[in-house]
Amino acid sequence: MFKTILLLAFWGRFRLGELTVPAQDNIKIEDTVLRLDVDLIGEEHQEQFLRVWLRKEKAAAHRAGSLVEIPKLPANLKKLCPFRTMTRYLQRMDKAGMSRFDPLFTDLSGSAMTPGKFSAGVKDAIRTTMPNIGQELFKTLKNHSCRSAIPTICQELECFIDKDILKSLGRWESDAYLQYLKSYQGALKTRRFVEEEIIKKISEARKQDAVFFRQT
């Protein structure tokens, strides 16, 4: 379950609070991703997607939810593929009798995943698998660590994604995604790139206008 949550949050740019419930005695159906909100789309040897209906977004409560699609990753990334991991998780939970109206991440005892339980599980896994650095590594992890991953990776690889595309992928209403960039220089590079693209587009538009007026 923990791996499924991590991969879903990473590739789907989810906030942890969007995939968990505040507490066992505070489950609001209208704010929770349920089993029925998740679909696996497509057939084998065709384009396949993991589709998640997010009923309520923290930063866009005025919207009536949001549809998030994550493609099945290529074979060389299968261990990091949320589609494959979710497929196995749903098969296991459906066999165990999970209701379509249960919170998506519910264990076999019927308890839904909370932020506290998730944090404790990740902390234990890191300490167990990386005893030498696990303690220090866990200190740097935050609830938004998965959500910030895509902007950070784009920065590290110097892969400058169009601002509007990046904001759309992460469902950011503002330029808040810039806060997730891990280095000041990287943030400046991203801003400069966006500004240069704007200038370039304006310049191209002016050139087209000039050509039009010369022809007329």
Show the residue positions of the predicted features.
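Conserved, ordered domain cores of eukaryotic regulatory proteins
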Residues: 70-119
